[in-house]
Structures are given as C-alpha cells and as structure tokens.
Swiss-Prot record:
The gene is ACTL9. Interacts with ACTL7A. GO terms for cellular component: acrosomal vesicle; actin cytoskeleton; perinuclear theca; sperm head. Its main location: cytoplasm. This is Actin-like protein 9. Keywords: Cytoplasm, Cytoplasmic vesicle, Cytoskeleton, Disease variant, Fertilization. Changing S345L: In SPGF53; uncertain significance; reduces interaction with ACTL7A.
Amino acid sequence: MDASRPKSSESQSSLEAPRPGPNPSPNVVNKPLQRDSPGMVADRLPPKTGAVVIDMGTGTCKVGFAGQASPTYTVATILGCQPKKPATSGQSGLQTFIGEAARVLPELTLVQPLRSGIVVDWDAAELIWRHLLEHDLRVATHDHPLLFSDPPFSPATNREKLVEVAFESLRSPAMYVASQSVLSVYAHGRVSGLVVDTGHGVTYTVPVFQGYNLLHATERLDLAGNNLTAFLAEMLLQAGLPLGQQDLDLVENIKHHYCYVASDFQKEQARPEQEYKRTLKLPDGRTVTLGKELFQCPELLFNPPEVPGLSPVGLSTMAKQSLRKLSLEMRADLAQNVLLCGGSSLFTGFEGRFRAELLRALPAETHVVVAAQPTRNFSVWIGGSILASLRAFQSCWVLREQYEEQGPYIVYRKCY
C-alpha cells in the first residue's frame, strides 16, 4: 500500500462510488410479530403526541418518529467542545458541536458519551439527544413519549438514569426502555432469533426467545467497527498518508466503500496482488493504493487478534457457543432464525462467510437460516419504531405519574 500526490490513472476509483451491498437472505418468518401498517400510525398517535424512538450507539445516534420505516436523522455519537469567548458581562461558557460538525474543527475537545455501547457521559449524551429532538426533529419533548434502546449487559443504574433523564431533564410525558437485541428481532418480524450484532463499539451474539434476552447464552467481543477503522488508519499512516481527527470520516468512507470479507482468507492472501489492488483518489487530490488491507481489515471480526491472557473467538464461533448453551429444541428454532445486525455486518462477502463458517461449526443435521436485511444497520431503531406503533404496546409506557409515585425503579416493573 502506498500514498502519493495525484497522477493520471484510469484504474483510480473515486470515493463517491458506492460499495455494492450484500444480497439479503430469504427472510423466513418464524412466529411472526403482529404488526400494523405504518399508514395506520396516525390513527393511534396524534401528530402532537407521536412517540419518538432514540437508538444511541457508540458510532451513531438514530432518531425518528414511531411508525416510520427508517430514522429521520442519524448523527455521529460525538460531541465537540471549546470554551466560549467571554461576553460583555464577563461570563464564559462552553460551545458545543454535535456529530460530524465536531470533527471539522481540530481545536475542539472531542467527547464520546458511549464506550462499548454503554453510556459513560450522561451530560454529553443528553446534549446530543436535545440537539436531535429540539433542533433536528423540532419537537417539544414534553409532548412526546420517548422510547430508548438499551444494550445487553447495560448496568441497572443506566436504565434508572434513562428514566430520570426522560422525566426530569427532557420532561417527557411517557418513556420506555427496550432491549436492543429484542428490537432487532422485531425488525425482522419475529419474536425469537439469534441476534448477531456487530456495530461500531462492540459485537454480540444474543439469543432472544419469545421477546426475552437469554443473557446466560450471550457472547460478547470488544472488537467492532471502531477497531477496524483504527486498523485501516494505521495502514494509511504507514503508507505515508498524514491523518488528523478531521480525517476520520475519510477513513470510514474507504472502509465502507472498498473493504470486503474474503470467503477464504488464506486463498485471498495467495492471489496475485494486482487482482485486488485498488488505487483510490481522495477528495483533496491525493491518491492511495490499497492491497491486502482491503480484506485484512474486516477479517478481524472473524479472526480477532489475541491479547495477553485472552484468546477471543470470531463471530461464527460466538454464534455456535450461544446456540450450544440452549436446550435442543430452542437451539433448533434459533438456528433457523439467525439475524445479522449492525453496520459492521454490511461488508460485501460478510453474510456468505459467516453462513459458511457457522454451517461448518454446527452438526451436519442442523438446519441453519441466516437473514441479512439490507437496512440491518438500522435494525434496532426499526424494531423500536414497530414496537412503539403497536396498539397493544400503548399501555406499556412508563407514565410521568407512575414515575412520580415510584421513582426510577418503575423501569424494572414496566420495561423488563
């Protein structure tokens, strides 16, 4: 791999060229979730009180109204801060920038409110929510129920804090906290399935049965999209391409558009380099040539590097381990409902490689069906949109009066 200034070459590719998307598997529905059509949402929730679904991940935060097919706004889960210049009164404050805008100015101090999917900076998280709700969606939060997604193994105190923020800070009339994995299953029109979710900050395999997480059989890998981006950035630096924090979007674009999963890593390594080498033209006119890095990058998800004291396993082995912790009957059911989710599962070749490895790992008689929806990077949000639109769900909201009577602990009775 090497980087250089612009030169004429017909083999160069522009970053504007979209990466071909993977072909979705047949969506075999097992035990379907009853759902109303999106067009009926207005009959249930008047526009002024329509529920808002918020799915905040380590990489992006998605927000939109329940009943929509996709989120209205998606922003990077990042906050940029710098001191304000003192006003005439002599008071100073903090100026903040949300999402992609925070990366543009190198002098900003960047804050990432989530770590491995878990909120660790509540002030920063609330600023992002407020910006999305009040500035982007332009809603008055005291008029709208709010549904938040919650990751596996989230601390109980985080769920209590979500309730407090929703009612005390955002002044919402009602709220709900829903499991991310369960919402992903709902997005596929089911109530049971093995969720294989690899996003920006963490990777999980979570069995969901009849709408409940089976945490005893859940596997976790602290390696996901941000690690792949860091790997690719290091390769670009070694090629002599200087990068700053404002170039992170550039690295992400290269990763999403050109990296792919090899069906057989060793065979791909043995191919002549000219068969997979790509020369890319960057927006600033520079060029960079990428070779094996294009498939070595997402290979980390299938063969994670060893770390001292740990021997992490890849996605396919994680899925096998989750299934083996289930009863035989449940294992057979969920093996036919393996659901790929998360933005880091969108690489070309990902679905085929995962399916082939899982089939080899399980007994020959196991019937395996892997579903890979084209919009699986939005699976959690879509599931929340479906759930908050159902007539049967409307009695499940945690209401302000209930919170005032019972405090944040109401979340355990109403949401889990």
